[in-house]
């Protein structure tokens, strides 16, 4: 009877996981279908504004990614991290966003949702190798801006409007392997303990970028005796690229008492990633039409111009990141991690290359993108005097300075973000599954050398709430482990 009771509990927990995954996928795929997840007018240029491919655990730390070794979450931007996962994991998230845009005396607020990535790591418990795969959003357009111009000319007043939609996503497949060493550490005066003191993990990913972005501009003249104008462009992008990563940790010191009980330690983490340049292929269509807008119905009168180009070649820039972290652990379970990370991506090579098509469009120019991140995590003490769910949670916070890959009027789009959140173990589940709750706030705009913002230029205040989940199998499910009867 006890066996059937345990089996029943396990099946209930399994069904809970399946329901949670189904709901998460339903919400996220609904947003993916729309692809309009970036209402910022800055998304007009290029492929749209890039979306961090990081999952909630990394975003809550300001985007720190390359050095973080955490066996209970997936880090899609660091291929080597998969080798350090404790078991097979599935991870995804959704994001609820609010953007407050201001330009001069005009203000506008937009609420929208966006999906996170779908990530999977397949690993045998206790193994040294792992396979990771997933789909993550890369860029998005979703802007809709307009202005009405009043003139004393014969043509009269007219309205200009600009809209964009679509986006790109990246699917990836990777492999990672870790090399570990152990060392005897003294425990008291006459004993010792064998501990892992050093490890190096190597990983590689191959990824495929694809998607379509659409931009449309309209000139609508109020006087119906004049015809109106519409210009639209569609670009379908695809690119095959690679990403390589390395992670290492070194035990700085560890203390054990004469009973061989752990007292405390400090560990250094280091990590780096590199993605080489890759070819970008684009199918482009551009149409310029004369239209007439009557009773909210737009009728095409004439096609003034139509051009299309297949397999136009360009470049995706190289990208690298490097970072480090130090971890302090205590016998009562308290754990503190302090980390820093830097990422750079040189988009100027796109304009300098012999590209057959201008994917940027507009008055902007390419620039060198970068992200500087600082983050920390804290695990409270977990001794018997304080064993509630919060004591077993991980609290995170971070700060990031962003430089975007576009410059306008000679000044680069930049911003800052502050974030915080908590990863909570999934109650009632006999696994290492976690639920992630986080928020992020920041600002984005075009500045000058002294840090001020152009007069009459667009400035955005951003706020985001994140909900994510990392699902792991029941701890007694030895997946990928041969059984006696195999």
What would you call each of these model-derived segments?
Residues 20-28:
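Bacterial N-terminal signal peptides
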Residues 35-486:
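Subset of outer-membrane beta-barrel
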Residues 29-34:
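Sec/Tat signal peptide C-region and signal peptidase I cleavage site
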Residues 3-19:
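Bacterial N-terminal signal peptides that target proteins for export
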């Amino acid at each position: 009877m006890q066996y059937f009771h345990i089996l029943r509990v396990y099946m209930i927990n399994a069904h809970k996981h399946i329901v949670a995954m189904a709901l998460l996928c339903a919400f996220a795929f609904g947003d993916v279908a729309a692809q309009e997840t970036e209402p910022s007018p800055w998304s007009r240029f290029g492929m749209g504004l890039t979306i961090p491919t990081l999952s909630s655990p990394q975003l809550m730390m300001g985007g720190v990614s390359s050095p973080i070794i955490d066996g209970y979450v997936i880090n899609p931007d660091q291929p080597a991290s998969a080798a350090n996962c404790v078991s097979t994991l599935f991870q995804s998230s959704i994001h609820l966003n609010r953007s407050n845009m201001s330009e001069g005396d005009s203000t506008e607020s937009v609420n929208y949702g966006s999906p996170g990535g779908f990530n999977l790591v397949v690993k045998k418990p206790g193994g040294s190798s792992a396979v990771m795969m997933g789909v993550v959003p890369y860029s998005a357009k979703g802007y809709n801006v307009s202005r009405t111009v009043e003139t004393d000319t014969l043509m009269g007043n007219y309205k200009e409007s600009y809209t964009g939609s679509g986006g790109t996503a990246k699917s990836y497949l990777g492999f990672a392997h870790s090399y570990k060493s152990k060392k005897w550490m003294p425990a008291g005066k006459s004993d010792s303990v064998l501990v892992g003191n050093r490890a190096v993990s190597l990983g590689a990913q191959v990824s495929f970028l694809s998607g379509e972005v659409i931009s449309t501009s309209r000139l609508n003249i109020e006087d119906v005796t004049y015809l109106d104008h519409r210009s639209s462009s569609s670009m379908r992008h695809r690119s095959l690229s690679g990403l390589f990563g390395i992670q290492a940790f070194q035990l700085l010191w560890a203390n054990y008492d004469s009973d061989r009980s752990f007292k405390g330690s400090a560990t250094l983490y280091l990590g780096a990633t590199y993605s080489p340049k890759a070819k970008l292929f684009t199918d482009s269509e551009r149409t310029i039409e004369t239209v007439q807008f009557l009773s909210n119905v737009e009728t095409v009168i004439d096609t003034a111009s139509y051009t299309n180009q297949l397999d136009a070649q360009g470049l995706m820039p190289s990208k690298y990141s490097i970072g480090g972290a130090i971890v302090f652990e205590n016998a009562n379970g308290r754990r503190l991690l302090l980390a820093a990370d830097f990422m750079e991506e040189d988009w100027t090579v796109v304009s300098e290359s012999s590209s057959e098509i201008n994917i940027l469009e507009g008055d902007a120019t390419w620039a060198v993108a970068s992200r500087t991140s600082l983050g920390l995590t804290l695990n409270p003490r977990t001794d018997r005097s304080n064993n509630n769910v919060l004591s077993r949670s991980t609290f995170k916070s971070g700060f990031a300075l962003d430089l975007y890959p576009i410059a306008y009027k000679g000044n680069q789009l930049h911003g800052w973000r502050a974030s915080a959140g908590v990863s909570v173990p999934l109650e009632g589940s006999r696994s290492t599954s976690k639920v992630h709750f986080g928020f992020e706030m920041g600002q984005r705009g075009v500045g000058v050398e002294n840090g001020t913002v152009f007069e009459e230029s667009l400035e955005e205040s951003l706020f985001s709430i994140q909900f994510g989940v990392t699902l792991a199998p029941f701890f007694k499910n030895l997946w990928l482990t041969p059984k006696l009867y195999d």
